[in-house]
Design a protein with these regions (language model features):
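Glycine/proline-centered hinge or cleavage motifs at structural transition points of membrane proteins
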Residues: 97, 161-162, 175
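Periplasmic/extracellular loop-to-transmembrane helix junction in inner-membrane transport proteins
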Residues: 17-59, 79-80
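Transmembrane alpha-helices
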Residues: 142-143, 165-197
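Generic hydrophobic transmembrane alpha-helix motif, especially the helices
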Residues: 91-135
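Hydrophobic positions within alpha-helical transmembrane segments of bacterial inner-membrane proteins
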Residues: 52, 56, 60-72, 76, ...
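Short, small-residue-biased leader/transition segments that mark boundaries at the very start
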Residues: 2-9
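Residue-level signal for discrete positions within transmembrane alpha-helices
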Residues: 48, 52, 88-91, 95, ...
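Cytoplasmic-entry segments and transmembrane alpha-helices of multi-pass inner-membrane transporters
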Residues: 66-105, 142
Length: 197
């Protein structure tokens, strides 16, 4: 165990030592600026972070409602037959490597966006669509787990009080599964951020 920690400390010291030129040669002000011109020696990281943030927020805005909605449909509304068909497909999509999604985006989505906007299709809108498609299966799978963890007795108590199915979903099931849904969204966001860096 101590050997493992020693290796971690050695790596940390090496990484810190290797990163020192960023602070000594470039400087913190230039490093955290919006100027990115490597040929001129300007390595501002803020434009890269802003782009990653913009694309991640757009992907979440598109992917979260679709992922949570799909999970609610599969757990609360869909028949067993539909569930048996769609659930394995969602699990399969969650395991597809990111490079495949990127290729799909370049071949299918980019030309569609280019035709729609009249541009080349290289931009935030294309990235939003690709990342949203990428994070939906992750959010859906984890939200399904969160919804399935809610005891059936809670739903039955809601029905016994006269609530409709939609009232039960909106007022009882979703609030009870809120923490699991937030976890699903955070993991989806992590995947989106990881792909934009």
């Amino acid at each position: 165990r101590s050997r493992g920690l020693g290796d971690v400390y050695k790596r940390q010291v090496f990484t810190t030592y290797s990163a020192l030129p960023v602070f000594t040669d470039i400087g913190l002000v230039d490093f955290f600026s919006f100027t990115w011109a490597p040929s001129e020696g300007h390595y501002g990281i803020m434009s890269l972070l802003a782009g990653s943030g913009l694309v991640t927020v757009g992907a979440l805005a598109m992917g979260v409602p679709l992922g949570v909605g799909t999970a609610v449909y599969l757990v609360e509304i869909a028949s067993k037959r539909v569930r048996r068909l769609i659930s394995p497909a969602v699990d399969l999509l969650a395991g597809i490597p990111s490079i495949i999604y990127g290729f799909f985006g370049m071949i299918i989505i980019r030309p569609f966006i280019a035709q729609l906007t009249g541009g080349l299709g290289f931009g935030a809108l294309t990235a939003w669509f690709v990342l949203a498609i990428m994070i939906v299966p992750t959010i859906t799978t984890l939200t399904i787990d969160a919804l399935n963890s809610i005891p059936m007795g809670i739903r039955e108590a809601s029905y016994a009080m006269g609530a409709t199915k939609w009232q039960t979903i909106y007022k009882v099931v979703l609030p009870a599964a809120k923490l699991g849904i937030v976890d699903a969204i955070v993991l989806g966001m992590g995947r989106a951020i990881g792909e934009t860096m």
